[in-house]
């Protein structure tokens, strides 16, 4: 059935028939026996909201905080074993530091009962970003430093826009939570540094790898005798999907707190680049590009597809232009394609990656992919649930997968990687690339959206009852 569906989906995913074809794929014979799908009612929404709230506390907030706070060296400590014991340090990485600052700020904003606990943690994160990670001599944030704030051979002294983006993200969120002028000034300084040094005024977007002084590093001719995998996966002299979707994310966060015309212009540019250059029919994304935006062949990342659907829709809301047809259409195509090609019919969950129309190449399940998938599926249900139950049913199966296989029932927290049999393939709970960001954001977003859906459902029911009197 999957092969036949794929041939048909090539023609259908970009049209209105995508939902009906997806429904055909979810025939009775394909349904996992352990799932009993619940109808989208207020009671159902509130039940799932309660469950996601419980996981947010048990498997994210209670295990990460305050043990991640480094009171000796500043910032946040990243390395933890399965049972949450500290492991040898990887240093202080800009991505991890920005993400943990953002999480603490968002908890303080969205959970008033926890504000007294998390506001000081957000302030702690900003202090590290401002006092240590920010380059006092040349501006911009270091890609990473050792625990004592010194430049290392592994991180080098370079600046990478992926890290710049998350440091900006954390500083902007911290200002929203704390109203500390220092956090706003840091976010503004970073944006101005990005504009002066990294923005590509000719082709749009940003140069991604820069020297400490802020000069873009150009691509080097490949030497077959010395193949090199770039640190972090970002090759110098090229542009990437991954960096630019997170620049869209961080500039969205910045524009929420600073309604500056230059920030709005850049946010509009980032949304157009992600939607119109990086995303392509039938709902996939190119991963790498030359500086003038010519795509470089690579695989399709299902997790980035569903995450980008959410980030584009978030950006249009921040810009005050919700329901833009081009953005909505592309966001839906990304999720539909991931469901069609990257979805595990048996256990639920999105696979790691594959090709646009071919077989899945990596059938493992990574924590951030599953959490972003949960968030995107409920968002699609909110927008298109009246047309089909596909998204809400997939949301329920996704949630069942996360509860059953991704969460650790003994020591709590989320396993980083699960194999095709549902058994944890990796068990460490923290490292520089695994913060509380993807799972924390997804669970907070999903809980809030479920409660909103429950309220809307009740309003519709009351309105319908009043109309029949």
Question: Where are the regions that the model predicts?
Answer:
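Bacterial N-terminal signal peptides that target proteins for export
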Residues: 1-11
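Bacterial N-terminal signal peptides
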Residues: 9-20
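Glycan-recognition and catalytic cores of secretory/periplasmic carbohydrate-active enzymes
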Residues: 24-469
């Amino acid at each position: 059935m999957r092969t036949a569906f794929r041939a048909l989906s090539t023609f259908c995913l970009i049209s209105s028939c995508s939902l009906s074809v997806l429904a055909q794929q979810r025939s009775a014979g394909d349904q996992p026996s352990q799932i009993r799908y619940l109808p989208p009612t207020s009671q159902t929404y509130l039940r799932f909201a309660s469950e996601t709230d419980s996981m947010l506390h048990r498997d994210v907030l209670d295990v990460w905080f305050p043990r991640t706070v480094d009171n000796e060296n500043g910032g946040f400590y990243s390395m933890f074993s399965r049972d949450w014991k500290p492991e040898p340090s990887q240093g202080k990485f800009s991505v991890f530091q920005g993400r943990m600052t953002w999480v603490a700020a968002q908890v303080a904003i969205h959970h008033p009962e926890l504000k007294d606990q998390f506001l000081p943690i957000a302030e702690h994160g900003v202090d590290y970003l401002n006092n240590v990670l920010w380059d006092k001599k040349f501006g911009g944030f270091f890609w990473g430093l050792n625990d004592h704030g010194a430049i290392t051979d592994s991180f080098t002294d370079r600046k990478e826009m992926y890290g710049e983006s998350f440091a900006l993200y954390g500083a902007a969120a911290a200002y929203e939570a704390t109203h500390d002028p220092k956090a706003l000034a840091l976010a503004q300084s970073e944006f101005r540094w990005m504009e002066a040094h990294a923005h590509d005024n000719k082709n749009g977007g940003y140069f991604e790898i820069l020297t400490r002084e802020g000069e873009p590093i150009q691509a080097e001719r490949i030497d077959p005798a010395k193949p090199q995998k770039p640190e972090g996966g970002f090759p110098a002299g090229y542009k990437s999907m991954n960096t630019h979707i997170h620049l869209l994310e961080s500039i969205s966060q910045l524009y929420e707190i600073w309604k500056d015309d230059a920030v709005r212009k850049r946010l509009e540019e980032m949304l157009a680049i992600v939607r119109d250059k990086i995303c392509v029919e039938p709902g996939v994304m190119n991963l790498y590009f030359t500086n003038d935006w010519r795509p470089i062949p690579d695989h399709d990342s299902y997790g980035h597809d569903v995450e980008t659907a959410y980030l584009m829709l978030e950006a249009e809301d921040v810009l005050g232009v919700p329901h833009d047809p081009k953005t909505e259409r592309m966001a839906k195509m990304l999720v539909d394609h991931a469901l069609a090609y990257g979805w595990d019919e048996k256990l639920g969950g999105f696979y790691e990656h594959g090709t646009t129309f071919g077989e899945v190449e990596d059938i493992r399940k990574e924590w951030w992919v599953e959490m972003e998938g949960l968030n995107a599926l409920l968002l699609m249900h909110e927008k298109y649930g009246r047309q089909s139950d596909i998204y809400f049913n997939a949301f329920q199966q996704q949630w069942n997968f996360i509860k059953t296989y991704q969460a650790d029932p003994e020591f709590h927290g989320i396993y980083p990687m699960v194999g095709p049999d549902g058994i944890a393939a990796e068990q460490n709970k923290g490292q520089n690339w695994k913060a509380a960001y993807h799972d924390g954001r997804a669970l907070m977003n999903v809980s809030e959206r479920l409660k909103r859906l429950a309220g809307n459902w009740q309003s519709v029911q009351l309105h319908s009852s009043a109309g029949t009197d």
